[in-house]
């Protein structure tokens, strides 16, 4: 009898367990769900079930901590500067510049220091720093120029230092690009939203073409396609078109959205008359050679630390201050490039390089890859010398009115991971201009991902050469909130911080384009030629 009761109790217990499992099956199987591996080439529809991370928790935590550290550093660099009236903001006209320890005679190699005291429109001395300034010295007749170094004492005074690199009459310039109140407003506005740019994705299914809105962030109110790079968690979303799969996305374009996060009062700081105003009017000095001996410098090599400024222009030629730079002729360039595989990864400022090179090396010919548009992959070949040079655009965000293909594009870290590398492989990287309209954390994460990909490359191929080209300065009066140089300067500082101590060569295009005074996102051929010559000095 006892045996029958025990069997009955076991049966009832089993029935209860089955009921519990049935009622909670979604939770149980959801908890056991294994992570999916996603790469950018894969597409998936957004579901309501949260997906587990594909990256190790440790590496994600390290990245998040690094992002947080950099953001905190930048927030300290650009503190909030609220103001009640434009009259209390920095005025170039009312500010003063005083040459310290003026000399009767200046010699090549001397340092010239200038004390800058900034005041507001009412003539009151400012009590804090943060103004976005640009210092430059130049001699138009000599086609000479160099940037100056600005030290902010955070009390309304600045030290502007120039190294006198050439003899002759030298003009001095310190531009107030934006007052500290404007810089603070741009920083706050930048990090408030992702919607200054509208992306449109083209989906193709046979003869049907449909455009839907795309974004770097998820709009949870609509059914969307998610394009995910699993390793670095880079993601791009598009609204899913009806009757088409997510895999049907072929092209993307973008437009500026009519939106601003600046107040009406703040917008007054960015009128053309208030951007790039000269503080030092008609200031110049005469510099003599003084028979000073020239310092003997070692050959330019990858991994060298670059001072500020890192060089200057004279007779239109860029001359470095930290290494012995050689002006390479056609024969030397030809010999250097023999057997080289060169990968240019980035934006249209690097595409200028691949357009310029055939003008110097007539044996380099474009190979037709049967792609269309300005942002197609470009390939230069010299079959006899076994030279290959490729330019490929970086992935999202890529801002352009022109339609570009997303069939064969990848994030720079992905492209680096696909390369085997060897002593004759060279990679050149640039990114930044297309990141300016978006919160800075996107740029920070991408820069960290690129660094990590380079470190992985060096593990499997330490002999591979990597060169980083920084951003060019661009048009002075372009829309400051979306594309202005203040955003570029913050990215320039961030990139230098993230890439410090990494064994790469740097073509400091920011410093170079200030020296040339181009103020053009696509500088003329003379500047491009000198950027390329600096690059060749690293690899030849």
Curated annotation (Swiss-Prot):
Alphabetical UniProt keywords: Glycoprotein, Secreted, Signal
A GO term from the CC aspect: extracellular region
Glycosylation sites: 24, 42, 87, 155, 205, 291
Recorded coiled-coil stretches: none
Location in the cell: Secreted
Free-text tissue specificity from the UniProt record: Intestine, and to a lesser extent in kidney.
Principal location listed in the UniProt entry: secreted
Gene3D superfamilies found in the cross-reference section: Immunoglobulins
Signal peptide location: 1-22
Keyword Membrane listed: no
Keyword Oxidoreductase: no
Family: Belongs to the NXPE family.
Name recorded for this polypeptide: NXPE family member 1
Organism this protein belongs to: Oryctolagus cuniculus
């Amino acid at each position: 009898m006892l045996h029958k009761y025990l069997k009955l109790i076991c049966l009832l217990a089993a029935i209860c367990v089955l009921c519990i499992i049935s009622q909670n099956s979604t939770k149980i199987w959801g908890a056991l769900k294994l992570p999916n591996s996603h790469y950018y080439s894969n597409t998936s529809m957004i579901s309501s079930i949260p997906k587990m991370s594909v990256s190790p928790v440790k590496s994600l935590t390290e990245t998040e901590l690094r992002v947080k550290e950099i953001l905190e550093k930048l927030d300290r660099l650009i503190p909030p500067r609220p103001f009640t009236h434009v009259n209390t903001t920095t005025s170039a006209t009312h500010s003063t510049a005083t040459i310290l320890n003026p000399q009767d005679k200046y010699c090549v190699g001397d340092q010239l220091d200038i004390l800058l005291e900034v005041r507001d429109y009412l003539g009151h001395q400012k009590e804090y720093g943060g103004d976005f300034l640009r210092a430059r010295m130049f001699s138009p007749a000599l086609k000479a120029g160099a940037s100056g170094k600005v030290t902010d004492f955070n009390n309304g005074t600045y030290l502007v230092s120039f190294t006198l690199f050439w003899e002759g009459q030298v003009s001095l310039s310190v531009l107030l690009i934006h007052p500290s109140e404007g810089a603070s407003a741009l920083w706050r506005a930048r990090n408030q939203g992702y919607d200054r740019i509208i992306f449109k994705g083209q989906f193709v299914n046979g003869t049907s073409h449909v455009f839907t809105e795309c974004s770097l962030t998820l709009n949870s109110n609509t059914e969307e396609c998610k394009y995910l790079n699993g390793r670095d968690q880079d993601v791009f979303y598009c609204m899913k078109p009806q009757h088409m799969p997510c895999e049907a996305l072929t092209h993307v374009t973008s437009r500026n959205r009519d939106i601003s996060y600046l107040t009406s009062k703040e917008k007054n700081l960015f009128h053309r008359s208030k951007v790039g105003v000269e503080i030092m009017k008609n200031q110049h000095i005469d510099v003599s050679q003084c028979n000073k001996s020239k310092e003997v410098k070692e050959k330019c090599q990858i991994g060298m630390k670059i001072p500020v400024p890192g060089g200057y222009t004279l007779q239109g030629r860029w001359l470095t201050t930290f290494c012995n730079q050689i002006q390479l002729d056609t024969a030397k360039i030809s010999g250097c490039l023999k057997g080289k595989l060169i990968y240019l990864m980035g934006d249209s400022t690097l595409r200028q390089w691949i357009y310029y090179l055939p003008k110097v090396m007539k044996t380099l010919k474009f190979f037709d890859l049967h792609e269309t548009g300005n942002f197609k992959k470009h390939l230069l070949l010299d079959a006899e010398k076994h030279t290959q040079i490729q330019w490929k655009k970086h992935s999202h965000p890529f801002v352009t009115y022109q339609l570009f293909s997303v069939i064969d594009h990848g994030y720079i870290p992905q492209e680096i991971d696909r390369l085997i590398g060897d002593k004759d492989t060279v990679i050149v990287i640039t990114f930044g201009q297309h990141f300016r309209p978006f919160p800075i954390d996107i740029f920070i994460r991408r820069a960290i991902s690129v660094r990590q990909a380079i470190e992985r490359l060096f593990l499997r191929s330490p002999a591979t050469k990597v060169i980083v080209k920084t951003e060019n300065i661009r048009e002075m009066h372009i829309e400051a909130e979306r594309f202005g140089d203040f955003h570029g300067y913050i990215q320039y500082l961030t990139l230098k911080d993230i890439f410090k101590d990494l064994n790469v060569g740097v073509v400091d295009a920011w410093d170079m384009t200030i020296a040339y005074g181009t103020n053009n996102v696509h500088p003329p051929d003379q500047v491009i030629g000198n950027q390329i010559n600096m690059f060749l000095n690293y690899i030849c």
